[in-house]
């Protein structure tokens, strides 16, 4: 039995909750039968490899959060800028870069649309990527695009810093 959770959720919002209830029962029964949790471990491994591919290309360590469910990863450009080039650069990014610029940039370069990291309508340079839907190479491409964005911003920052001296 294969069913895409998004289709199940769509059916649920259309008022057809019985299919969702049946699917959840099947998931629960499968989990009880898989006493070694091998399926869950395999899925977690795939998701974590995707996350690692993104951050490896970005050039920073994968954030460690013991409470994370790892379904999404949140890339905060302010924190990433700080890790890559220091506090002064991160402050400059917050004052001078359009918060949505990185979302459009990644979409243009990779064909992948990321969601705003801090919620819709919040002006903060961050992005949220689902780790459930793409192939590992696509997450690496996202990381590469974000790193390129940071490098270009750093060159702008250095140029602006020289002018101000």
Predicted regions and their residues:
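PLP-dependent class I/II
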Residues: 1-165
């Amino acid at each position: 039995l294969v069913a895409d959770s998004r289709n199940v959720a769509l059916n649920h919002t259309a008022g057809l909750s019985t299919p969702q209830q049946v699917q959840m029962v099947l998931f629960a029964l499968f989990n009880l039968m898989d006493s070694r949790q091998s399926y869950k471990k395999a899925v977690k491994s795939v998701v974590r490899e995707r996350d690692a591919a993104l951050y490896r290309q970005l050039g920073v360590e994968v954030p460690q959060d013991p409470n994370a469910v790892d379904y999404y990863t949140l890339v905060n450009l302010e924190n990433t800028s700080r890790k890559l080039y220091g506090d002064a650069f991160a402050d400059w990014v917050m004052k001078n870069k359009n918060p949505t610029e990185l979302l459009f940039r990644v979409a243009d370069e990779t064909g992948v649309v990321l969601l705003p990291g801090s919620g819709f309508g919040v002006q903060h340079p961050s992005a949220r990527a689902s780790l459930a839907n793409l192939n590992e190479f696509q997450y690496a491409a996202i990381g590469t695009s974000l790193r390129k964005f940071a490098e270009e911003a750093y060159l702008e920052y250095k140029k602006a810093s020289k002018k101000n001296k």
